[in-house]
């Protein structure tokens, strides 16, 4: 019996990953750190911005109902084509390797503003009672375009965040997941359409509070964490850099993907983003500059690479408006993955059988790899996060 137990312990020791103490964490690359030491080496020697991974665009979006899509197509065929995509539930996306999620939110502090979509009424659709009940509750709602493109895998922000948090709890070693948010408040030219409430500083205060109602601050890479004791967030990013990969595994960072007045409203007079939950898409000359949305991978390639090499975190897109999928055109995808942008967003982690084989995934089946513009030789071709 003791012999069997001893054999079992020996087998466990032989197959378990090496402890950090057994690894050469000052080795020049992950492969030289010792047997089973790549993870420990990367966690200590790579920073959050030293990676590249794939995520999804408008991650919450379900397909527009056929009758409403037909109505849109009658008046604007090209717009209808651009809206003709959808996603599987967030949990399934994460299981498939997505490490960036995009959520569009509308402000609905009293509830009920989006409970009765005009498009559904116009074409005679009867919505499930649970939809109206859910949308009647106070809080931020998640949708693409009010009244016509309103279906979501998680109709409320809290539901989306709870799903992300639950997945993270079951997979605590994941690389930091980027959650970008669009704050939607544009009107649309549709009969009977809702007029969205505008995003002012009070609305953004409520948005931060709703995020913190689900995620504790210690599970979020906040601007304050990155800034530390530097005068500005930009100074911290360019002079010291982002936290290490090891310090950010199992965590999330949130970014407000907006410009101009919305960024000003979110900052609310702050020098950088002191006390805020989200980073903002601030221009490089802003004290709050740290994260940038540069979506045009074909034309912004040099800009993306330059900013990544400086130390900024960048999100770009592999495809848009179903164009690349319909044409099976991989040029934008390939440019995006090679540009250095840390988070590359797609609507097609899996192909859409209606269009063809186009999809956007990390090479070699990786979930995340060393960033191609930040000394990728350090990873020696090994994954930062392996296939799920």
Question: Where in this protein do the model-derived segments appear?
Answer:
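Catalytic cores of phosphodiester-bond hydrolases, prominently lipid phosphodiesterases
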Residues: 20-388
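Positively charged n-region of N-terminal signal peptides that target proteins for export
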Residues: 1-4
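Bacterial N-terminal signal peptides
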Residues: 6-16
């Amino acid at each position: 019996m003791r012999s069997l137990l001893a054999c079992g312990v020996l087998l466990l020791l032989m197959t378990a990953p090496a402890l950090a103490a057994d690894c050469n964490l000052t080795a020049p690359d992950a492969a030289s750190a010792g047997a089973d030491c790549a993870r420990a080496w990367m966690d200590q020697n790579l920073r959050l911005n030293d990676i590249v991974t794939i995520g999804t665009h408008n991650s919450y979006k379900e397909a527009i109902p056929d009758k409403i899509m037909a109505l849109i197509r009658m008046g604007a065929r090209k717009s209808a084509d651009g809206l003709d995509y959808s996603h599987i539930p967030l949990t399934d996306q994460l299981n498939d390797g997505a490490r960036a999620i995009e959520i569009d939110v509308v402000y609905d502090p009293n509830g009920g503003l989006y409970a009765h979509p005009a498009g559904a009424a116009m074409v005679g659709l009867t919505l499930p009672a649970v939809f109206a009940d859910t949308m009647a509750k106070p809080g931020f709602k998640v949708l693409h375009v009010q009244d016509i493109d309103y279906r979501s895998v998680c109709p409320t922000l809290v539901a989306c965040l709870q799903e992300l948090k639950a997945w993270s709890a079951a997979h605590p070693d994941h690389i930091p997941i980027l959650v970008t948010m669009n704050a939607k408040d544009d009107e649309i030219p549709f009969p009977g359409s809702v007029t969205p409430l505008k995003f002012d500083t009070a609305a953004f205060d409520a948005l931060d509070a709703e995020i913190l109602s689900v995620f504790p601050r210690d599970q979020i890479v906040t601007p304050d964490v990155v800034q530390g004791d530097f005068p500005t967030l930009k100074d911290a990013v360019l002079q010291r850099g982002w936290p290490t990969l090891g310090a950010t595994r199992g965590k999330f960072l949130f970014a407000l993907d907006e410009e101009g007045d919305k960024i000003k409203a979110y900052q609310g007079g702050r020098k950088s983003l002191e006390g805020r939950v989200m980073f903002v898409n601030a221009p490089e000359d802003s004290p709050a500059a740290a994260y940038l949305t540069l979506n045009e991978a074909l034309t912004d390639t040099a800009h993306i690479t330059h900013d990544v090499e400086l130390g900024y975190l960048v999100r770009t897109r592999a495809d848009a408006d179903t164009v690349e999928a319909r044409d099976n055109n991989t040029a934008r995808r390939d440019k995006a993955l090679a540009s250095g942008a840390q988070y590359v967003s797609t609507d097609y982690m899996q192909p859409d059988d209606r269009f063809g084989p186009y999809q956007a995934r990390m090479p070699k089946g990786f979930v995340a790899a060393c960033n191609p513009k930040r000394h990728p030789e350090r990873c020696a071709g090994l994954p930062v996060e392996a296939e799920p």
